[in-house]
C-alpha cells in the first residue's frame, strides 16, 4: 500500500517525509484503518467466494419464486453506502441523536415519493417507512390498533394467506405468534372456485366481531375485492388492513386494483414486485374516520399510534441505507418503464399459466390475474417438495406451497411460481413457454425417480432424502440442468447492460 502511494505521488519524497509516511502507515495498520479500506475479496476471500458463487447461481438459474426480484444498481449503490453508518432513533425533525440533517432529508423524500407513487393526499394519508420487513410491519400495525387478546381475521395460510395474518393449525397449535398475541380466526376460499368466500366471511365476521380484518395474500392468484372487504369490515365495526406486499408494484403501475380507496391501513414489503430493497411501509389514514347518526365526526388517530408502535414500541434505530435505497426504488416505480415492466409481468403470468395448462397442469382458481400462479400437483402423482427439489437441481428456483385442503406445509400438493424476476431479466411469452416445458419435463423425471424410492422407507423425511440422492446422481437431471444454465445465462442481470 505504502509503495503504491510513493509511486503515485506527484513529486519525490524527501527522506524525512518518507520516514513519516512509513510511521503513519504503521500506525494506521496497527489500529485497523487499512483493514477498513480493503475490499472483501482482499480481506475475506472465503466470504467473497460464497458471494461469487451466489452471483453465478442467480445468473445461471431461472428465478420463479414470486416474492423474489432483481433490484437495480442504483438501489444497490445506496444499500452499500455511508447511509448505513448513522444512528437515527426517532423521526425527521425529532431524533434522539445529532447529525441527522441529511438522514432526515432522505427519509422525508422517501415518504413523499411513497405517497405520490400511489396518488395519496398527504392531508388524508401518512406513511411510515422504518419497518424492517413485512411481517414486523404487520405486527406493528396490529399492535397500534389492538390490545393483546383482541380479535382479528385473515386468509388461512393453506388457502393463500400469510403467516403474519395470524396462522394457527386446526388443532389449535399457534404457528404464528400473532395468533398468541391476538385471537385469530381464518377465512377461506370456496373449494369449488378457489376464490375468497366473501359470503361466509361476512357471516362469520358478524359472529366473531374482529377488531381487524386483513385483506392480503401470499399465494392467491386472483384480484381481491377490496370494496366487498370494506363492506364486511363496516358491518362488524372492524378496521380493514390491506397487505399488498405481493402486488404493490402492480398497484403502483396501475395494472392491479388499488386497496387504498377502501382501506384504513395498507402495509407492503418493498422488495417483491416493487423491486426495491428489503424493507416495508405502513400507510395509514388521517382525518375523518366516520360520522355518527347524530352527526358527530369520529377522527382517525392512526398517525401517532402507528408511528409509536414502530418506534419506540418495537424498533430502535431505523436502517437508513434501506430507506434511502427505497426512495430510489420509488422514483423508479414512477417511470413509464416501470409501468411497461409491470404490464409485462401480468401478461407473462397469463401466458405462463396457459402454457402450463396446455401441458396438463391444474391451476388453483383456474388461472391468474396477478404475477403468480399456484399449481395443484395432486393429479400428477408428485408433491411440491419433490418438484421443488428436482427443479433446484435443474437450476430453476420455485417453491413448494400449500393449497386448499393440504395438511402439511413440509410436503404440500402445490408449487408456487411467478414472473417478476425473470421479466426483469427480459423474459417474454416465448421464454415462459419454454420454462413451462422445463417444468413438465421435471415432473416426468421426478415421477421416475420417486418410483425408485425404497418401499420399506416409511418415514416421509427418509423417502425425500432418497429422492434428493437420486436427483443428484441422475445423468438426465445433470444434462438438463446444464442446458437450463447455459440458456438463462444469456439474459442479463441488472448491472450488465
Curated annotation (Swiss-Prot):
The modification N6-(pyridoxal phosphate)lysine is found at residue 272. Its main location: mitochondrion. Its cofactor is pyridoxal 5'-phosphate. Pfam families: SHMT (PF00464). GO terms for molecular function: glycine hydroxymethyltransferase activity; pyridoxal phosphate binding. Keywords: Mitochondrion, One-carbon metabolism, Pyridoxal phosphate, Transferase, Transit peptide. Pathway: One-carbon metabolism; tetrahydrofolate interconversion. CDD domains: SHMT. InterPro entries: PyrdxlP-dep_Trfase (IPR015424), PyrdxlP-dep_Trfase_major (IPR015421), PyrdxlP-dep_Trfase_small (IPR015422), Ser_HO-MeTrfase (IPR001085), Ser_HO-MeTrfase-like (IPR049943), Ser_HO-MeTrfase_PLP_BS (IPR019798), SHMT-like_dom (IPR039429). It is found in: Mitochondrion. Its EC number is 2.1.2.1. It catalyses: (6R)-5,10-methylene-5,6,7,8-tetrahydrofolate + glycine + H2O = (6S)-5,6,7,8-tetrahydrofolate + L-serine. Residues 1-27 form a transit peptide. GO terms for biological process: glycine biosynthetic process from serine; tetrahydrofolate interconversion; tetrahydrofolate metabolic process. It is an enzyme of class 2 (transferase). It comes from the Eukaryota. Interconversion of serine and glycine. Homotetramer. In eukaryotes there are two forms of the enzymes: a cytosolic one and a mitochondrial one. NCBIfam families: PRK00011.1 (NF000586). This is Serine hydroxymethyltransferase, mitochondrial. It comes from Eremothecium gossypii (strain ATCC 10895 / CBS 109.51 / FGSC 9923 / NRRL Y-1056) (Yeast). The lineage of its organism: Eukaryota, Fungi, Dikarya, Ascomycota, Saccharomycotina. The gene is SHM1.
